[in-house]
């Protein structure tokens, strides 16, 4: 098997196979109420406490479209550079399951609210474009709970009727890394827009992964299998790896691949068959007679476009142009809207004498390390942007060294303490007086005369020894730049 950032190939005997991947992402719409009822969508509520008569499919109850959910879907479509359809139709998708009280799901089949679009991925080997086939609105089902009662399956209808956007990609992805980048980019766009929170651990973003394999260089698509409801990027990558190899092994053994729906077992790290894959006619789609076609005007769409915030790709370009950061650094900074906000606040608080390199390094290095260690989001950062900017300025103006700054940063974490106060209380101000440093270096050279002679005779590696001695004697407070300059003069 060949794996790198640009290709993912499976080698068997005389054949080399490539993997073809498409995703159907189910994104829960950020909305206070459901798609066709006024019931709350609050996560974590007690079972069956957020269920209206419409959600429970009581006879005679009619759905009423939530305009806000429609706006959220259109905004997402705009963010995906997609065609917004001024006329869309809600259909009934007919199937039976215990947590689907209507006996059908209200979805969109032939006429979705959003058409084709694109998502640009920043990969290590360059940019990759993934096509969007469509985005349609649909209602979520309830939740079946199998592990609370040994004899029965329990049903919680709190989720029933919650608005979902199903975002269907084209089969343009070829590697697990591209799938990871696609999910992250999609989540980032929706978080910028405020249309989906993207919290996979809460189930508000999950995906069906469609996989097929074919001989490298072939244009013909293989038989695809769908892996249902994968709710983490790590599991998606593991599922793709297992399923692709399973399909290749079947082909190499002369067997056929069945078109089917499969489940990823997270304990065994393997996929297993659930049922044969349904085609559209199996669901007997037809327009919902209780809902008129949804029609929106150009004016309605333009008004939503005017409210679209700066999105990741545009923000990345601005960061590169305005702040002179690298494309790689900009990609990291804009990938999460809260990180981008934090960075811009740090830059604003740094004042006129800005050092962008220091700002980027401290945010993506020291701060990210603390957040990862404490399992915190940047919005929960124990160090405010204001105080991090102060710390960076103290380094920039020579008040403290980078080494001392790391010590101060560790102290700042406990209570978001002003770094200037720490410097004053702990006596950590950097020694930058040339005369004082000359006297210190003269003493070090005098104490180590033999090494000074060796250095002058060509043993240049000893320069680091003298720098180390200067930092040791000064308690780490000596200005490293001045130490280097003075030592070079003294040791000539």
Swiss-Prot record:
Pfam families reported in the protein's UniProt record: GatB_N (PF02934), GatB_Yqey (PF02637)
Annotated disulfide bonds: none
GO molecular function annotations of the record: asparaginyl-tRNA synthase (glutamine-hydrolyzing) activity; ATP binding; glutaminyl-tRNA synthase (glutamine-hydrolyzing) activity
GO biological process: glutaminyl-tRNAGln biosynthesis via transamidation; translation
Catalytic activity: L-glutamyl-tRNA(Gln) + L-glutamine + ATP + H2O = L-glutaminyl-tRNA(Gln) + L-glutamate + ADP + phosphate + H(+); L-aspartyl-tRNA(Asn) + L-glutamine + ATP + H2O = L-asparaginyl-tRNA(Asn) + L-glutamate + ADP + phosphate + 2 H(+)
Record key words, sorted: ATP-binding, Ligase, Nucleotide-binding, Protein biosynthesis
EC numbers for this chain: 6.3.5.-
Family: Belongs to the GatB/GatE family. GatB subfamily.
Function: Allows the formation of correctly charged Asn-tRNA(Asn) or Gln-tRNA(Gln) through the transamidation of misacylated Asp-tRNA(Asn) or Glu-tRNA(Gln) in organisms which lack either or both of asparaginyl-tRNA or glutaminyl-tRNA synthetases. The reaction takes place in the presence of glutamine and ATP through an activated phospho-Asp-tRNA(Asn) or phospho-Glu-tRNA(Gln).
Record note on quaternary structure: Heterotrimer of A, B and C subunits.
HAMAP family xref list: GatB
Designated name of the protein: Aspartyl/glutamyl-tRNA(Asn/Gln) amidotransferase subunit B
Gene designation per UniProt: gatB
């Amino acid at each position: 098997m060949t794996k790198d950032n640009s290709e993912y190939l499976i080698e068997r005997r005389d054949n080399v196979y490539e993997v073809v991947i498409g995703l159907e992402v189910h994104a829960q719409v950020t909305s206070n109420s459901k798609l066709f009822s006024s019931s709350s969508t609050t996560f974590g509520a007690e079972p069956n406490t957020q269920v209206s008569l419409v959600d429970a499919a009581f006879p005679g109850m009619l759905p009423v479209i939530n305009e806000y959910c429609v706006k959220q879907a259109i905004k997402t479509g705009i963010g995906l550079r997609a065609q917004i359809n001024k006329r869309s139709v809600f259909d009934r998708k007919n199937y039976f399951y215990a947590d689907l009280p209507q006996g059908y799901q209200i979805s969109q089949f032939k006429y979705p609210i959003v058409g084709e679009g694109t998502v640009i991925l920043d990969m290590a080997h360059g940019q990759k474009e993934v096509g969007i086939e469509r985005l349609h609105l649909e209602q979520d089902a309830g939740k079946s709970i199998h592990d609370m009662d040994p004899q029965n399956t329990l049903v919680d209808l709190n989720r029933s009727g919650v608005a979902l956007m199903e975002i269907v990609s084209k089969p343009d992805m070829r590697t697990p890394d591209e799938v990871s980048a696609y999910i992250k980019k999609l989540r980032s766009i929706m978080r910028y827009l405020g249309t989906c929170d993207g919290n996979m651990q809460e189930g508000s973003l999950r995906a069906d992964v469609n996989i097929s394999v074919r001989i490298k260089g072939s244009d013909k698509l293989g038989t695809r299998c769908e892996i249902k409801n994968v709710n983490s990027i790590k599991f998606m990558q593991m599922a793709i790896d297992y399923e692709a190899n399973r399909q290749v092994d079947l082909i190499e053994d002369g067997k056929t691949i069945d078109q089917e729906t499969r489940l990823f077992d997270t304990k065994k790290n393997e996929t297993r068959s659930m049922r044969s894959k349904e085609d559209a006619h199996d669901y007997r789609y037809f327009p919902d007679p209780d809902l008129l076609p949804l029609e929106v005007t150009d004016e309605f769409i333009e008004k939503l476009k005017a409210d679209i915030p700066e999105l990741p790709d545009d923000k990345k370009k601005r960061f590169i142009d305005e702040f002179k950061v690298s494309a790689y650094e900009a990609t990291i900074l804009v990938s999460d809207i809260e990180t981008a906000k934090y960075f811009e606040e740090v830059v604003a608080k740094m004042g006129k004498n800005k050092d962008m390199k220091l700002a980027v390094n401290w945010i993506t290095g020291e701060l990210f390390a603390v957040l990862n260690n404490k399992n915190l989001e940047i919005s929960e950062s124990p160090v405010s942007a204001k105080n991090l900017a102060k710390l960076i300025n103290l380094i920039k103006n020579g008040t403290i060294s980078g080494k001392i700054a790391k010590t101060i940063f560790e102290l700042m974490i406990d209570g978001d303490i002003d770094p200037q106060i720490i410097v004053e209380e702990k006596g950590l101000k950097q020694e930058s007086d040339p005369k004082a440093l000359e006297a210190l270096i003269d003493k070090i050279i005098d104490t180590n005369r033999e090494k000074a002679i060796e250095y002058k005779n060509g043993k240049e590696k000893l320069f680091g020894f003298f720098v180390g001695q200067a930092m040791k004697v000064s308690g780490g407070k000596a200005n490293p730049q001045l130490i280097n300059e003075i030592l070079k003069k003294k040791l000539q």
